[in-house]
Amino acid sequence: MKNYIINDLDDNTMNSSRKARNDVFIFAKQAGFKEILSPFIIHPQDRSFKAKLQKLKYSKITIPKLLKNANDADVIVFQYPMYSTFLMNHLIEDIKKDTHAKLVYVIHDIEGIRMFDDTDNYSDNELRLLKQAGGIIAHNQPMTDWLKEHGITVPIVNLGIFDYQNPQLINQNMDYNKSVVFAGSLEKSTFLTKLNLKDTKLTLYGPNPADHYPDCIQYEGKLSPEELPKKLTQNFDLVWDGDELDTCFGTYGHYLQFNAPHKTSLYLSSGIPVIIWKKAAMAKFIEENHVGFAIDNLNDLECPCANHG
């Protein structure tokens, strides 16, 4: 059987989301998948006439040429979604038209869940694209259930947790000082501005910090996915989202009930236990595998830190 994976990565735009896609590509290559290199290098926010012409060239010339080199494919793995809906539509249509391969999606995000906490407002176009798959690798059972509830009937398997390419050795001599780290896009983590910890220090990494944080929080800047593991020396890592301390509320908080954040994989690959919202989809994995703790309320954050030294 000849298996291919599409590589739509741009090394010049590596960030946390690109890290997740790059890791999937690396592990697929290690498993013997061949590469279909798709050089779609256009900034997602570029609406210029030049960008439109470039997309047209990609759709009419580049994509068909790429698929000619994979006309013997039995399986083509596609990382969903791409940044450009226009190119994603053309790529999927051409794979279906020009090859006999089974098209398998590895889901990174589903915008119908991520951007709308009212699931009646899901995108018809997104569901149409998802229905084009021959198979889907979803994050977990809650995401699979959502897909099925919205009419997706193709075979679906659950990933559970993303693998994480982490060359950094695990620190075997870590001091216990009730320390916690949080990494991510800080503009969507406004709960941090409300946190009041007495005996625990929280270290932050990520872009777009707030103008001010409480004294219990120390902001250490933005690091690349390659540099960040070198700095993870804390006792616990936090997975939380939204505006509130007593729940993961709002669009991003709601999404935690369905997705498997790549940062969870970063933390565990660094040998650090995770503290996560009890209603998050990943909470069951964390507790069943004894790799952290699930809590209902961030006001309880200091309890596992104090009791599990």
What is the role of each PLM region?
Residues 115, 131-156:
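A short, active-site helix/loop in glycosyltransferases that binds the activated sugar's phosphate group
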Residues 229-270, 276-284:
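Nucleotide-sugar-dependent
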Residues 83, 142-144, 187-188, 274, ...:
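Alpha-helix capping/helix-boundary segments
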Residues 164-233:
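Conserved catalytic-core segment of nucleotide-activated headgroup transferases in glycan assembly
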Residues 1-91, 96-104, 113, 277-282, ...:
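N-terminal pre-catalytic "stem/leader" segment of glycosyltransferase-like enzymes
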Residues 67, 94-98, 118-136:
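Membrane-proximal helix-turn-helix segments that form the acceptor-binding/catalytic region
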Residues 303-309:
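Conserved donor-nucleotide binding/catalytic region of nucleotide-linked donor-dependent transferases
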Residues 289-295:
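A short acidic/histidine/glycine-rich donor-binding loop in glycosyltransferase catalytic cores
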